[in-house]
Amino acid sequence: MCNYKFETLQLHVGQEQPDPATDSRAVPIYQTTSYVFKNSAHAAARFGLADAGNIYGRLTNSTQDVLEKRIAALEGGVAALALASGAAAINYTIQALAQDGGHIVAQKTIYGGSYNLLEHTLPHFGITATFVDAHNLAEVENAIQGNTRAIYLETLGNPNSDIPDIDAIAEIAHRHSLPLVIDNTFGTPYLIRPIEHGADIVVHSATKFIGGHGTTLGGIIVDSGKFDWKASGHYPAIADPNPSYHGVSFADAVGPAAFVTYIRAILLRDTGATISPFNAFLLLQGVETLSLRLERHAENTKKVVAYLAHHPQVEHVNHPSLPEHPDHALYEKYFPNGGASIFTFNIKGWQKEAHKFIDSLKIFSLLANVADVKSLVIHPATTTHSQLTDEELADQGIAQNTIRLSIGTEHIDDIIADLEQAFEAVKAAE
């Protein structure tokens, strides 16, 4: 189906024909733990990876399989792996690349959970990271060490929607024989396909825009199929014979899909961050309307940004669509159809004013999720990024008067009216 447009692919890939057992047009929920083998030889072939197919529910499920094929197609990859959460997708990706003793060069303005994983958790497992200003290409390149195993970016940084130059950093990564990993949670494949700009691996918290309705946890890893895992000798887990599969080399056995196959066959098998069939089904419901929702998110965001940019109680708006934003040129290059519906602004005042504004909102929900059809709000410094020191917060552009918004799909007049009455509440409390 590679010749079809995005809007068609999001509806059909992975289930081009009705379900063969029931003729169901909707993707069924295959709520099972395990699968019957035809005979002993068939079972042995499945377990030995000689025959592709379902083995056990921790590894694969037919509902999950449709989701994986659909996201892989939308991102332009060769294969994907759906997992229980976005955190699992990021963790497995980093562990598969760095192993014990590896090093990651990471953009410093990333999701707080990813920052904590790289800065505090993974060092206990022998994996270290250097955080860099992704706008400074020399700093990115100079951070590469002999044990570096990947460069890690977000298409739109969290929470400020800053944008790295993916093409330029991909060139640096590949010149050093490193894969470029990009978290495209905020970008989505509808707005940007990082693989087309040189990314080798794309990860998602499917909980966000892919699901879109705040109901379902999930994560996705997409393999571009373009990285040569054998060339540098730095990725033995993927390229060399694996003792737990009788000497199978994933790079040799499955070729372009080696990376996600390794994670499925080893990390997922042994540590079990499995997505449930029902969650895979719910995420598929979200995928089917992804383009429609993103258009409305982008349309509403454009109007909210314009409103905030001229509001007398706003100190600063961090949105790359604004001409004065340092990433405006990159925004026009990588996001020609708009986007960045999760962004921050600084209210005049400090934490007291920020909290009063947030607590006065009526349509916006105060919660930790983003990219819901409902508009959301949070105070990053005391919640999502509260584990960071004051110095780390400042380094990521987060102050005590910074407020993160996730613009939903409600009517724009109601969204702006809610923001305005919250500003009035702040003024009345002075």
List the model feature ranges, each with a label.
Residues N39-N91, G113-H120:
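Conserved N-terminal alpha-helix of the aminotransferase class I/II PLP-enzyme fold
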Residues L156, T185-G187, L322, K348, ...:
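Active-site beta-loop-alpha junctions enriched in small/polar residues
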Residues T271-T274, F278-A280, Q285, T289, ...:
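Conserved small-domain helix->loop->beta segment predominantly found in fold-type I
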Residues M1-N61, K69-R70, I403:
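N-terminal "arm"/small-domain region of PLP-dependent enzymes with the aminotransferase-like
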Residues V222, T344-N346, S406-G408:
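Short hydrophobic/aromatic beta-strand micro-patches
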Residues C2, G14, P18, A80-A309:
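Conserved PLP-enzyme active-site core in the AAT-like
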Residues E119, T128, G146, R293, ...:
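PLP-dependent enzyme catalytic core of the Aspartate aminotransferase-like
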